[in-house]
Amino acid sequence: MKYQPFFFLLFLMSFSLFSQEMISEIKPLKSEKWYGAFTAKAFCNTPLKDITFQPYLANEMKIDLRTNNKGNQAAPLLISNKGRFVWNDEPFAFEFKDGSLILYSEFKKIEAVTDGKTLRDAYLSAMKKYFPPSGKMPNELMFKMPQYNMWIELNYGQDQPKILKYGSDVISNNFPTGVFMIDDIWSKDYGNFDFDLGKFSDPKAMVDELHAKGFKVMLWLTPFVSPDSKEFEYLAKNNCLVLKKNTKNPALIKWWNGYSACLDLSKPQAVDWLRTKLTNLQATYGIDGFKFDAADFYFYSAESPVFPNEDTNTTGPIQAEMFGKLGAEFDFNEFRAGWKNGNQALAQRLQDKGYSWDELKLLVPDMLSAGLIGHPFTCPDMIGGGLLQNFENIDYKTFDQELMVRSAQIQALMPMMQFSVAPWRVLDEKHLNIVREAAQLHAKMGNQITELAKKATVDGEPIVRHLEYAFPNQGFESCDTQFMLGELYLVAPMLEKGFTRTVKLPEGNWLDDLGKTHSGGKTINIDVPLNRLPYFKKLN
Protein backbone atom coordinates (compact mmCIF):
# COMPACT_ATOMS: atom_id res chain seq x y z
CA MET A 1 0.00 0.00 0.00
CA LYS A 2 1.45 3.31 -1.04
CA TYR A 3 2.50 5.72 1.70
CA GLN A 4 2.26 9.38 0.65
CA PRO A 5 4.22 11.92 2.77
CA PHE A 6 2.69 15.35 3.13
CA PHE A 7 4.31 18.71 2.46
CA PHE A 8 4.67 19.65 6.09
CA LEU A 9 7.10 16.81 6.76
CA LEU A 10 9.91 19.01 5.47
CA PHE A 11 9.03 21.38 8.27
CA LEU A 12 8.86 18.57 10.80
CA MET A 13 12.46 17.62 10.15
CA SER A 14 13.65 20.83 11.76
CA PHE A 15 10.78 21.35 14.21
CA SER A 16 11.06 20.26 17.85
CA LEU A 17 8.18 19.64 20.21
CA PHE A 18 10.33 20.07 23.26
CA SER A 19 9.50 23.20 25.23
CA GLN A 20 12.13 22.75 27.92
CA GLU A 21 15.04 21.11 26.21
CA MET A 22 17.99 19.52 27.87
CA ILE A 23 20.87 19.64 25.43
CA SER A 24 23.82 17.26 25.29
CA GLU A 25 26.88 17.58 23.10
CA ILE A 26 28.83 14.42 22.28
CA LYS A 27 32.26 15.40 20.99
CA PRO A 28 33.61 13.14 18.22
CA LEU A 29 36.42 10.69 18.70
CA LYS A 30 39.06 10.42 16.01
CA SER A 31 37.56 8.88 12.83
CA GLU A 32 34.26 8.25 14.61
CA LYS A 33 31.14 7.62 12.53
CA TRP A 34 27.55 7.45 13.76
CA TYR A 35 24.67 5.29 12.53
CA GLY A 36 21.11 4.52 13.56
CA ALA A 37 17.77 6.12 14.53
CA PHE A 38 16.11 5.41 11.16
CA THR A 39 15.79 2.63 8.61
CA ALA A 40 14.86 4.93 5.71
CA LYS A 41 17.13 7.62 4.30
CA ALA A 42 14.36 9.62 2.65
CA PHE A 43 10.79 9.49 1.46
CA CYS A 44 9.99 7.81 -1.83
CA ASN A 45 11.36 9.49 -4.96
CA THR A 46 13.46 12.06 -3.11
CA PRO A 47 16.21 13.08 -5.57
CA LEU A 48 19.35 11.09 -4.85
CA LYS A 49 21.42 14.27 -4.64
CA ASP A 50 19.28 15.42 -1.71
CA ILE A 51 19.68 12.24 0.34
CA THR A 52 22.14 11.84 3.18
CA PHE A 53 23.25 8.28 3.77
CA GLN A 54 24.62 6.69 6.92
CA PRO A 55 27.04 7.11 8.55
CA TYR A 56 25.89 10.63 9.29
CA LEU A 57 27.92 13.56 8.01
CA ALA A 58 29.74 16.04 10.22
CA ASN A 59 26.86 18.48 9.71
CA GLU A 60 23.27 17.23 9.60
CA MET A 61 19.93 19.01 10.01
CA LYS A 62 18.03 18.50 13.25
CA ILE A 63 15.57 15.61 13.14
CA ASP A 64 12.88 15.05 15.77
CA LEU A 65 12.09 11.40 16.50
CA ARG A 66 8.85 12.37 18.18
CA THR A 67 7.25 13.45 14.91
CA ASN A 68 9.28 11.89 12.12
CA ASN A 69 9.92 8.22 11.38
CA LYS A 70 10.72 8.87 7.69
CA GLY A 71 7.91 6.51 6.72
CA ASN A 72 9.64 3.48 8.21
CA GLN A 73 11.04 2.00 11.39
CA ALA A 74 12.71 4.28 13.94
CA ALA A 75 14.40 3.79 17.30
CA PRO A 76 15.88 6.06 20.00
CA LEU A 77 19.32 4.62 19.24
CA LEU A 78 22.54 5.92 17.72
CA ILE A 79 25.68 3.78 17.57
CA SER A 80 29.25 4.56 16.55
CA ASN A 81 32.09 2.61 15.02
CA LYS A 82 34.17 3.44 18.09
CA GLY A 83 32.05 1.41 20.50
CA ARG A 84 29.78 4.19 21.73
CA PHE A 85 26.00 4.37 21.73
CA VAL A 86 23.18 6.69 22.70
CA TRP A 87 19.81 5.39 23.90
CA ASN A 88 16.86 7.13 25.49
CA ASP A 89 13.56 5.42 26.27
CA GLU A 90 11.67 8.50 25.10
CA PRO A 91 12.04 10.09 21.65
CA PHE A 92 14.59 12.86 21.23
CA ALA A 93 15.84 15.22 18.55
CA PHE A 94 19.39 15.22 17.24
CA GLU A 95 21.68 16.93 14.78
CA PHE A 96 25.37 17.01 13.92
CA LYS A 97 27.42 20.21 14.07
CA ASP A 98 31.06 20.15 13.02
CA GLY A 99 31.26 16.48 13.90
CA SER A 100 29.62 16.79 17.31
CA LEU A 101 26.39 14.93 18.02
CA ILE A 102 23.88 17.32 19.61
CA LEU A 103 20.96 15.72 21.46
CA TYR A 104 17.77 17.46 22.58
CA SER A 105 15.42 15.93 25.15
CA GLU A 106 12.62 17.14 27.40
CA PHE A 107 13.04 14.16 29.71
CA LYS A 108 16.67 14.02 30.75
CA LYS A 109 20.18 14.89 29.68
CA ILE A 110 21.33 12.13 27.35
CA GLU A 111 24.88 10.81 27.56
CA ALA A 112 26.88 8.51 25.31
CA VAL A 113 27.84 5.11 26.69
CA THR A 114 31.16 3.52 25.79
CA ASP A 115 31.30 -0.27 25.75
CA GLY A 116 33.88 -1.59 23.32
CA LYS A 117 35.75 -0.29 20.30
CA THR A 118 33.68 -1.23 17.25
CA LEU A 119 30.26 -0.80 15.66
CA ARG A 120 29.36 -4.35 16.62
CA ASP A 121 30.46 -3.76 20.21
CA ALA A 122 28.21 -0.71 20.44
CA TYR A 123 25.24 -2.49 18.89
CA LEU A 124 25.54 -5.59 21.08
CA SER A 125 25.86 -3.56 24.26
CA ALA A 126 22.79 -1.44 23.50
CA MET A 127 20.80 -4.42 22.23
CA LYS A 128 21.42 -6.60 25.27
CA LYS A 129 20.34 -3.82 27.61
CA TYR A 130 17.43 -2.22 25.76
CA PHE A 131 16.03 -4.52 23.05
CA PRO A 132 17.18 -8.09 23.69
CA PRO A 133 15.93 -10.90 21.44
CA SER A 134 12.46 -12.17 22.24
CA GLY A 135 13.23 -15.78 21.33
CA LYS A 136 10.54 -15.60 18.65
CA MET A 137 10.37 -14.83 14.93
CA PRO A 138 7.73 -14.54 12.21
CA ASN A 139 6.64 -17.76 10.55
CA GLU A 140 9.45 -19.59 8.74
CA LEU A 141 7.63 -19.45 5.41
CA MET A 142 8.19 -15.70 5.28
CA PHE A 143 11.91 -16.41 5.00
CA LYS A 144 11.95 -19.65 3.04
CA MET A 145 9.88 -18.68 0.02
CA PRO A 146 9.03 -15.53 -1.95
CA GLN A 147 6.00 -13.52 -0.90
CA TYR A 148 3.29 -12.18 -3.22
CA ASN A 149 1.41 -8.95 -2.54
CA MET A 150 -1.66 -7.94 -4.55
CA TRP A 151 -1.17 -4.16 -4.38
CA ILE A 152 0.40 -3.41 -7.77
CA GLU A 153 -1.67 -5.81 -9.86
CA LEU A 154 -5.05 -5.25 -8.19
CA ASN A 155 -4.59 -1.95 -6.29
CA TYR A 156 -8.05 -0.88 -5.04
CA GLY A 157 -9.74 -3.57 -7.13
CA GLN A 158 -9.05 -6.55 -4.87
CA ASP A 159 -11.61 -9.27 -5.59
CA GLN A 160 -11.91 -13.04 -5.44
CA PRO A 161 -11.53 -13.94 -9.16
CA LYS A 162 -8.46 -11.74 -9.67
CA ILE A 163 -6.82 -12.97 -6.50
CA LEU A 164 -7.30 -16.61 -7.45
CA LYS A 165 -5.96 -15.89 -10.94
CA TYR A 166 -2.78 -14.33 -9.52
CA GLY A 167 -2.28 -17.42 -7.36
CA SER A 168 -2.71 -19.68 -10.39
CA ASP A 169 -0.33 -17.51 -12.42
CA VAL A 170 2.39 -17.91 -9.78
CA ILE A 171 2.21 -21.67 -10.23
CA SER A 172 1.80 -21.74 -14.01
CA ASN A 173 4.89 -19.54 -14.36
CA ASN A 174 6.92 -21.91 -12.17
CA PHE A 175 7.47 -19.52 -9.28
CA PRO A 176 7.64 -20.94 -5.74
CA THR A 177 4.49 -20.57 -3.66
CA GLY A 178 4.70 -18.72 -0.36
CA VAL A 179 2.92 -15.98 1.56
CA PHE A 180 0.03 -14.33 -0.30
CA MET A 181 -1.06 -10.82 0.79
CA ILE A 182 -4.48 -9.39 -0.07
CA ASP A 183 -4.12 -5.61 0.01
CA ASP A 184 -6.36 -2.50 0.11
CA ILE A 185 -9.35 -2.72 0.11
CA TRP A 186 -11.10 -6.05 0.73
CA SER A 187 -13.85 -4.78 3.07
CA LYS A 188 -16.57 -2.18 2.54
CA ASP A 189 -15.12 0.42 4.93
CA TYR A 190 -11.89 1.11 6.76
CA GLY A 191 -12.34 -0.28 10.24
CA ASN A 192 -14.73 -2.94 8.97
CA PHE A 193 -13.14 -6.35 9.28
CA ASP A 194 -15.29 -8.55 7.12
CA PHE A 195 -15.04 -9.26 3.40
CA ASP A 196 -17.09 -7.18 0.97
CA LEU A 197 -19.39 -9.88 -0.39
CA GLY A 198 -19.87 -7.86 -3.56
CA LYS A 199 -16.22 -8.53 -4.37
CA PHE A 200 -15.71 -11.83 -2.52
CA SER A 201 -18.57 -14.24 -3.12
CA ASP A 202 -17.11 -16.99 -0.91
CA PRO A 203 -14.07 -15.81 1.07
CA LYS A 204 -13.64 -19.11 2.90
CA ALA A 205 -13.54 -21.05 -0.38
CA MET A 206 -11.02 -18.56 -1.76
CA VAL A 207 -8.72 -18.96 1.24
CA ASP A 208 -9.11 -22.74 1.11
CA GLU A 209 -8.13 -22.77 -2.56
CA LEU A 210 -5.06 -20.61 -1.92
CA HIS A 211 -4.07 -22.91 0.94
CA ALA A 212 -4.46 -25.93 -1.33
CA LYS A 213 -2.12 -24.28 -3.85
CA GLY A 214 0.56 -23.91 -1.16
CA PHE A 215 0.01 -20.30 -0.05
CA LYS A 216 -0.53 -18.75 3.37
CA VAL A 217 -2.93 -15.81 3.29
CA MET A 218 -2.53 -12.38 4.91
CA LEU A 219 -4.87 -9.36 4.90
CA TRP A 220 -3.93 -5.68 4.81
CA LEU A 221 -5.21 -3.33 7.52
CA THR A 222 -4.67 0.06 9.13
CA PRO A 223 -5.87 1.61 12.41
CA PHE A 224 -8.12 3.99 10.44
CA VAL A 225 -11.92 3.91 10.64
CA SER A 226 -14.32 5.35 8.07
CA PRO A 227 -16.30 8.10 9.84
CA ASP A 228 -19.60 7.14 8.18
CA SER A 229 -19.40 3.48 9.21
CA LYS A 230 -21.25 1.61 11.93
CA GLU A 231 -17.86 0.71 13.43
CA PHE A 232 -17.14 4.42 13.96
CA GLU A 233 -20.32 4.82 15.98
CA TYR A 234 -19.47 1.88 18.23
CA LEU A 235 -15.83 2.85 18.70
CA ALA A 236 -16.64 6.48 19.46
CA LYS A 237 -19.20 5.44 22.06
CA ASN A 238 -16.66 3.14 23.74
CA ASN A 239 -13.80 5.65 23.78
CA CYS A 240 -11.61 3.69 21.38
CA LEU A 241 -10.70 6.50 18.98
CA VAL A 242 -8.03 9.19 18.90
CA LEU A 243 -9.67 12.43 20.00
CA LYS A 244 -9.47 15.89 18.56
CA LYS A 245 -7.06 18.16 20.37
CA ASN A 246 -8.52 19.68 23.55
CA THR A 247 -11.90 17.98 23.05
CA LYS A 248 -13.65 14.70 23.68
CA ASN A 249 -14.67 14.31 20.04
CA PRO A 250 -13.06 11.82 17.62
CA ALA A 251 -10.49 13.43 15.34
CA LEU A 252 -10.48 13.06 11.58
CA ILE A 253 -6.91 12.51 10.45
CA LYS A 254 -5.60 13.08 6.94
CA TRP A 255 -3.85 10.08 5.43
CA TRP A 256 -3.18 8.84 1.91
CA ASN A 257 -6.78 7.67 1.41
CA GLY A 258 -8.53 10.78 2.68
CA TYR A 259 -9.78 11.62 6.16
CA SER A 260 -10.63 8.99 8.75
CA ALA A 261 -10.98 8.42 12.45
CA CYS A 262 -8.23 6.35 14.04
CA LEU A 263 -8.02 3.73 16.75
CA ASP A 264 -6.17 4.96 19.81
CA LEU A 265 -3.83 2.04 20.35
CA SER A 266 -2.87 3.30 23.80
CA LYS A 267 -6.41 2.35 24.91
CA PRO A 268 -6.68 -1.32 25.96
CA GLN A 269 -10.29 -1.45 24.82
CA ALA A 270 -9.28 -0.35 21.30
CA VAL A 271 -6.57 -2.98 21.07
CA ASP A 272 -8.92 -5.65 22.44
CA TRP A 273 -11.54 -4.71 19.85
CA LEU A 274 -9.05 -4.95 16.98
CA ARG A 275 -7.56 -8.21 18.28
CA THR A 276 -11.03 -9.76 18.42
CA LYS A 277 -11.79 -8.69 14.85
CA LEU A 278 -8.54 -10.21 13.59
CA THR A 279 -8.87 -13.50 15.43
CA ASN A 280 -12.46 -13.77 14.16
CA LEU A 281 -11.12 -13.49 10.60
CA GLN A 282 -8.75 -16.33 11.36
CA ALA A 283 -11.46 -18.50 12.88
CA THR A 284 -14.08 -17.77 10.22
CA TYR A 285 -12.04 -17.80 7.03
CA GLY A 286 -8.71 -19.41 7.90
CA ILE A 287 -6.70 -16.19 7.45
CA ASP A 288 -3.11 -16.79 8.50
CA GLY A 289 -1.96 -13.28 9.38
CA PHE A 290 -2.03 -9.57 8.71
CA LYS A 291 -0.16 -6.72 7.05
CA PHE A 292 -0.26 -3.81 9.53
CA ASP A 293 0.06 -0.54 7.61
CA ALA A 294 0.21 3.14 8.69
CA ALA A 295 0.81 4.26 12.34
CA ASP A 296 3.32 6.86 11.13
CA PHE A 297 4.34 9.42 13.72
CA TYR A 298 3.18 12.49 11.81
CA PHE A 299 -0.48 11.43 12.06
CA TYR A 300 -0.20 12.30 15.75
CA SER A 301 2.23 15.24 15.62
CA ALA A 302 1.81 18.85 16.71
CA GLU A 303 0.55 19.69 13.23
CA SER A 304 -2.20 17.05 13.29
CA PRO A 305 -5.54 17.74 15.04
CA VAL A 306 -4.82 15.37 17.95
CA PHE A 307 -3.16 15.32 21.39
CA PRO A 308 -3.17 16.55 24.00
CA ASN A 309 -6.66 16.40 25.46
CA GLU A 310 -8.30 15.40 28.71
CA ASP A 311 -8.52 11.81 27.58
CA THR A 312 -4.96 11.11 26.48
CA ASN A 313 -1.55 12.65 26.02
CA THR A 314 0.04 9.86 24.00
CA THR A 315 2.39 10.33 21.04
CA GLY A 316 2.95 8.97 17.55
CA PRO A 317 5.84 6.74 18.62
CA ILE A 318 3.69 5.19 21.35
CA GLN A 319 0.91 4.47 18.85
CA ALA A 320 3.40 2.74 16.53
CA GLU A 321 4.93 0.79 19.40
CA MET A 322 1.53 -0.49 20.56
CA PHE A 323 0.60 -1.47 16.99
CA GLY A 324 3.75 -3.59 16.88
CA LYS A 325 2.98 -5.26 20.20
CA LEU A 326 -0.38 -6.37 18.83
CA GLY A 327 1.15 -7.56 15.57
CA ALA A 328 3.67 -9.73 17.37
CA GLU A 329 0.77 -11.89 18.57
CA PHE A 330 0.29 -13.16 15.00
CA ASP A 331 2.60 -15.70 13.40
CA PHE A 332 2.35 -14.00 10.00
CA ASN A 333 2.67 -10.22 10.16
CA GLU A 334 4.21 -7.31 8.29
CA PHE A 335 4.95 -3.73 9.37
CA ARG A 336 6.29 -0.66 7.60
CA ALA A 337 6.21 1.94 10.40
CA GLY A 338 7.51 1.13 13.85
CA TRP A 339 9.04 2.43 17.05
CA LYS A 340 11.23 0.63 19.58
CA ASN A 341 10.20 -2.83 18.38
CA GLY A 342 13.77 -4.08 18.05
CA ASN A 343 14.23 -7.86 18.01
CA GLN A 344 10.51 -8.57 18.30
CA ALA A 345 8.86 -11.23 16.16
CA LEU A 346 7.86 -8.69 13.52
CA ALA A 347 8.41 -8.82 9.77
CA GLN A 348 9.43 -5.29 8.85
CA ARG A 349 9.27 -3.91 5.30
CA LEU A 350 11.14 -1.03 3.75
CA GLN A 351 8.88 1.83 2.74
CA ASP A 352 7.69 1.92 -0.87
CA LYS A 353 10.30 2.66 -3.50
CA GLY A 354 9.84 4.00 -7.00
CA TYR A 355 10.83 2.13 -10.14
CA SER A 356 14.17 3.76 -10.93
CA TRP A 357 17.87 3.08 -10.60
CA ASP A 358 18.16 5.84 -8.01
CA GLU A 359 15.50 4.20 -5.86
CA LEU A 360 17.21 0.82 -6.31
CA LYS A 361 20.35 2.31 -4.78
CA LEU A 362 18.46 2.80 -1.50
CA LEU A 363 17.64 -0.86 -0.88
CA VAL A 364 20.99 -1.98 0.50
CA PRO A 365 21.60 1.15 2.63
CA ASP A 366 18.11 0.92 4.14
CA MET A 367 18.46 -2.79 4.87
CA LEU A 368 21.81 -2.17 6.56
CA SER A 369 20.26 0.55 8.71
CA ALA A 370 17.31 -1.66 9.65
CA GLY A 371 19.73 -4.21 11.05
CA LEU A 372 21.61 -1.59 13.05
CA ILE A 373 18.46 -0.51 14.93
CA GLY A 374 17.45 -4.06 15.78
CA HIS A 375 15.32 -5.31 12.88
CA PRO A 376 16.77 -8.56 11.52
CA PHE A 377 13.47 -9.76 9.98
CA THR A 378 13.19 -7.20 7.20
CA CYS A 379 11.85 -7.28 3.63
CA PRO A 380 13.40 -4.87 1.07
CA ASP A 381 10.04 -3.57 -0.25
CA MET A 382 8.30 -5.08 -3.27
CA ILE A 383 10.38 -6.08 -6.28
CA GLY A 384 10.26 -3.10 -8.61
CA GLY A 385 8.78 -0.92 -5.88
CA GLY A 386 5.31 -0.12 -4.64
CA LEU A 387 4.15 2.80 -6.80
CA LEU A 388 1.10 2.07 -8.93
CA GLN A 389 1.90 4.68 -11.57
CA ASN A 390 5.15 2.92 -12.46
CA PHE A 391 3.25 -0.14 -13.73
CA GLU A 392 0.11 1.33 -15.27
CA ASN A 393 -0.16 1.97 -19.02
CA ILE A 394 3.32 0.58 -19.60
CA ASP A 395 5.06 1.30 -22.89
CA TYR A 396 6.68 -2.09 -23.35
CA LYS A 397 9.04 -0.71 -25.99
CA THR A 398 10.75 1.50 -23.43
CA PHE A 399 10.07 -0.34 -20.15
CA ASP A 400 13.42 -1.05 -18.42
CA GLN A 401 13.40 -4.82 -17.93
CA GLU A 402 17.01 -4.83 -16.75
CA LEU A 403 15.95 -2.82 -13.70
CA MET A 404 13.32 -5.42 -12.79
CA VAL A 405 15.93 -8.18 -13.00
CA ARG A 406 18.39 -6.36 -10.76
CA SER A 407 15.62 -5.57 -8.27
CA ALA A 408 14.77 -9.27 -8.00
CA GLN A 409 18.42 -10.26 -7.68
CA ILE A 410 18.99 -7.86 -4.78
CA GLN A 411 16.19 -9.54 -2.85
CA ALA A 412 17.21 -13.11 -3.63
CA LEU A 413 19.80 -13.20 -0.85
CA MET A 414 18.01 -11.04 1.67
CA PRO A 415 15.87 -12.30 4.57
CA MET A 416 12.63 -11.90 2.61
CA MET A 417 11.68 -11.52 -1.04
CA GLN A 418 8.36 -10.00 -2.13
CA PHE A 419 6.71 -9.72 -5.55
CA SER A 420 3.78 -7.45 -6.32
CA VAL A 421 3.89 -6.46 -9.98
CA ALA A 422 3.51 -9.75 -11.83
CA PRO A 423 6.85 -10.33 -13.59
CA TRP A 424 5.11 -12.46 -16.23
CA ARG A 425 3.05 -9.38 -17.18
CA VAL A 426 5.88 -6.89 -17.65
CA LEU A 427 8.83 -9.03 -18.81
CA ASP A 428 9.71 -10.92 -21.95
CA GLU A 429 10.74 -14.56 -21.68
CA LYS A 430 14.46 -13.82 -21.40
CA HIS A 431 14.10 -11.44 -18.46
CA LEU A 432 11.33 -13.50 -16.86
CA ASN A 433 13.59 -16.55 -16.79
CA ILE A 434 16.26 -14.61 -14.89
CA VAL A 435 13.77 -13.25 -12.36
CA ARG A 436 12.44 -16.79 -11.90
CA GLU A 437 16.01 -17.95 -11.23
CA ALA A 438 16.34 -15.27 -8.54
CA ALA A 439 13.14 -16.51 -6.88
CA GLN A 440 14.38 -20.08 -7.06
CA LEU A 441 17.74 -19.04 -5.58
CA HIS A 442 15.92 -17.51 -2.62
CA ALA A 443 13.94 -20.73 -2.18
CA LYS A 444 17.14 -22.77 -2.47
CA MET A 445 18.79 -20.64 0.23
CA GLY A 446 15.58 -20.57 2.28
CA ASN A 447 16.71 -23.05 4.90
CA GLN A 448 19.99 -21.20 5.46
CA ILE A 449 18.19 -17.85 5.70
CA THR A 450 15.70 -19.36 8.14
CA GLU A 451 18.56 -20.64 10.30
CA LEU A 452 19.96 -17.10 10.40
CA ALA A 453 16.55 -15.87 11.53
CA LYS A 454 16.44 -18.50 14.26
CA LYS A 455 19.92 -17.48 15.36
CA ALA A 456 18.79 -13.85 15.55
CA THR A 457 16.05 -14.85 17.99
CA VAL A 458 18.82 -15.92 20.36
CA ASP A 459 21.76 -13.56 19.75
CA GLY A 460 19.88 -10.48 18.46
CA GLU A 461 22.35 -9.84 15.63
CA PRO A 462 21.34 -8.58 12.18
CA ILE A 463 20.82 -10.99 9.30
CA VAL A 464 21.84 -8.38 6.73
CA ARG A 465 25.04 -6.91 8.14
CA HIS A 466 27.05 -3.81 7.42
CA LEU A 467 30.61 -4.61 6.35
CA GLU A 468 31.88 -2.27 9.08
CA TYR A 469 29.89 -4.33 11.60
CA ALA A 470 31.39 -7.59 10.39
CA PHE A 471 34.92 -6.41 9.53
CA PRO A 472 35.85 -3.38 11.64
CA ASN A 473 38.77 -1.12 10.84
CA GLN A 474 39.15 -2.34 7.26
CA GLY A 475 37.77 0.79 5.58
CA PHE A 476 34.10 -0.21 5.31
CA GLU A 477 32.62 2.66 7.34
CA SER A 478 30.71 4.06 4.34
CA CYS A 479 30.32 0.88 2.29
CA ASP A 480 26.63 0.57 1.41
CA THR A 481 26.64 -1.17 -1.97
CA GLN A 482 27.37 -4.64 -0.63
CA PHE A 483 26.34 -6.52 2.49
CA MET A 484 26.93 -9.63 4.54
CA LEU A 485 24.20 -12.27 4.75
CA GLY A 486 24.99 -13.56 8.21
CA GLU A 487 28.65 -14.30 8.83
CA LEU A 488 29.30 -16.34 5.70
CA TYR A 489 28.16 -14.60 2.50
CA LEU A 490 29.20 -11.26 1.07
CA VAL A 491 26.62 -10.15 -1.52
CA ALA A 492 27.45 -7.50 -4.12
CA PRO A 493 24.39 -6.92 -6.34
CA MET A 494 24.23 -4.63 -9.34
CA LEU A 495 22.77 -1.29 -8.28
CA GLU A 496 23.09 0.63 -11.52
CA LYS A 497 22.60 -0.03 -15.18
CA GLY A 498 25.49 -1.98 -16.67
CA PHE A 499 27.42 -5.21 -16.48
CA THR A 500 30.55 -4.51 -14.41
CA ARG A 501 31.15 -3.38 -10.85
CA THR A 502 33.86 -3.21 -8.20
CA VAL A 503 33.75 -5.30 -5.03
CA LYS A 504 35.78 -4.55 -1.94
CA LEU A 505 36.68 -7.82 -0.24
CA PRO A 506 37.58 -7.99 3.47
CA GLU A 507 40.73 -9.77 4.51
CA GLY A 508 40.76 -13.53 4.10
CA ASN A 509 39.87 -15.89 1.27
CA TRP A 510 36.58 -15.78 -0.60
CA LEU A 511 34.88 -18.21 -3.00
CA ASP A 512 32.64 -16.47 -5.53
CA ASP A 513 29.40 -17.68 -7.10
CA LEU A 514 31.32 -18.83 -10.20
CA GLY A 515 33.67 -21.07 -8.19
CA LYS A 516 36.70 -18.77 -8.27
CA THR A 517 38.75 -18.10 -5.12
CA HIS A 518 39.85 -14.55 -4.29
CA SER A 519 42.33 -13.22 -1.76
CA GLY A 520 40.73 -10.46 0.29
CA GLY A 521 41.96 -7.15 1.57
CA LYS A 522 41.60 -5.54 -1.85
CA THR A 523 39.12 -4.23 -4.40
CA ILE A 524 38.40 -6.28 -7.50
CA ASN A 525 36.60 -5.56 -10.76
CA ILE A 526 34.08 -8.17 -11.88
CA ASP A 527 31.82 -8.80 -14.83
CA VAL A 528 28.14 -9.01 -13.97
CA PRO A 529 26.11 -10.23 -16.94
CA LEU A 530 22.37 -9.91 -16.58
CA ASN A 531 21.92 -13.42 -15.20
CA ARG A 532 24.54 -13.04 -12.45
CA LEU A 533 24.10 -12.07 -8.81
CA PRO A 534 27.65 -11.82 -7.42
CA TYR A 535 28.22 -13.28 -3.99
CA PHE A 536 31.28 -14.53 -2.14
CA LYS A 537 31.47 -17.22 0.51
CA LYS A 538 33.95 -16.68 3.31
CA LEU A 539 36.48 -19.52 3.55
CA ASN A 540 38.32 -20.77 6.63
Predicted segments with their positions:
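Bacterial Sec-dependent N-terminal signal peptides
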Residues: M1-E21
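Catalytic and substrate-binding clefts that recognize carbohydrates or anionic sugar/phosphate headgroups
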Residues: S19-M142, Q160-S172, A470-F471, N525-L539
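Aromatic- and carboxylate-enriched substrate-binding clefts and catalytic-loop regions
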Residues: T52-P55, P176-R436, E468-F471, G486
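Generic recognition of flexible, low-complexity loop/linker segments
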Residues: D64-R66, Q73-A75, G135-M137, S168-V170, ...
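Extracellular structured ligand-interaction cores
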Residues: N72-P76, N81-R84, P91, M145, ...
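Short, glycine-/Ser/Thr-/acidic-enriched flexible segments
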Residues: R84, P91-A93, E153, S187, ...
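N-terminal small/glycine-rich loop or linker at the start of catalytic domains
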Residues: P138-E153, N249-C262
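Carbohydrate-binding surfaces of carbohydrate-active enzymes
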Residues: D169, N173-N174, E209-K216, K325-L326, ...
